[in-house]
A protein has these predicted regions:
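Secondary-structure transition motif
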Residues: 1-127
Length: 127
């Protein structure tokens, strides 16, 4: 069993994911660049890997947008986030009415889902 934590980093000031990065003890994240060795990105959003993969074996991270054929509601498009009250990752979608607008993201749900984007590069998928 692999107990390593995996993260990905979105640099808001550059509108891109940082692929080669190091977190320092002071909380700064440095990025390797070809020009001056290392440069700092100050507006970083850190997203954790959930430990789950979708039906195409892609790693699911916080902020990913998934589509799943959910029995009760049909095709659902939602975003992955960590819900502190649940103590779990959930798939949350936009829904009005008295019914819940999320499901717990477990192995069965992940296996049935497909990553179609993320909240930074394809936010319109959630509209």
């Amino acid at each position: 069993m692999n107990n390593r934590f995996k993260f990905r980093f979105w640099c808001s000031s550059e509108n891109r994911f940082i692929t080669d990065s190091v977190i320092h003890g002071d909380g700064k994240i440095s990025v390797k660049t070809g020009i001056c060795g290392r440069d700092y990105c100050h507006d970083v959003v850190i997203q954790q890997y959930t430990g789950l993969t979708d039906s195409k074996d892609k790693e699911i991270c916080e902020g990913d947008i998934l589509i799943i054929d959910y029995d009760t509601f049909g095709n659902v498009i939602g975003r992955v986030l960590y819900e502190t009250d649940q103590g779990a990752y959930i798939l949350q979608w936009k829904r009005t009415g008295p019914n819940q607008n999320y499901i717990n993201l477990n192995c069965d749900v992940a296996f049935e889902s497909v990553i179609i984007g993320n909240i930074f590069e394809t936010p319109l998928l959630l509209k």
